[in-house]
């Protein structure tokens, strides 16, 4: 597909889609990073559904909330004793704003089982575009970097979706720099983006205007989630929301980051988007995960790959 500077490639790529699934790739609050995109797409007339690879105790929800095997349809009224429930928190916020309020949730799974769950949901909703959203950029790691961040859920999501027959499959990242806490070298992130560009798989960067409707509502949703989950607010989305609001530097908003120096900055408010299949093709260990059923299997196979790899790329300091 040929893109133009006049139209953001992210929106150009999704223009033919009728029904779009935006799914948090890394679990937990990652789905919130897709909210500005979802709001913009809905304003343009697209039908958008939200999904999340959940860290909540989905086994505790009522049976009526299960749409199918390994696919829960979380609504504002979904009952659960689990206090950490980002999907329900988001569903309630959406309902309060008179928006479609179902957030689909997948339990932690291996590649084969998550792929089956995605296939079920895609068929159920007649989806023709899937966008995996990552809060941070460690989803762009290919395996030979100095550190991979927290790859388990991200790579499981990529491996699950890349094999599905869906016309449009994208990955977008919001929160550049956040994964430094987990050892990610962001020069290597930029190196990977450049390689994806050479392969024709980079759809550019798109900043969220701080005064836009999408930005205002996103900040409101993040604040609502922080209030609903005071013991475990999203560090990732808290920093992104601060960046989207024009904040800079060591912006503290939770005791969870006390003792750490944050670096909130405008790069965190930019979507970096790539073609999902191109990204999957560059992963050095994706084939090892193909037959996994459980999350534990994914973890052990990533660990085995990292133990076997002869050398990793030497991290570099950003020179500017």
What do the predicted segments below correspond to?
Residues 226-320:
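C-terminal accessory domains and tails appended to enzymatic cores
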Residues 81-112, 133-135, 169, 176, ...:
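Cap/lid and interdomain-hinge subdomains that line or gate substrate/regulatory clefts
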Residues 42-43, 48-105:
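Glycine-rich nucleotide/cofactor/substrate-binding loop typically near the N-terminus or early
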Residues 22-32, 146-149:
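Short, glycine-rich nucleotide/cofactor-binding loops
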Residues 101-164:
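Internal, conserved structured core segments that host functional sites
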Residues 31-50, 154-163:
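Histidine-anchored nucleotide/phosphate-binding helix
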Residues 66-90, 190-220:
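A glycine-rich helix N-cap at a beta->alpha junction
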Residues 1-20, 25:
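Positively charged, low-complexity intrinsically disordered leader regions
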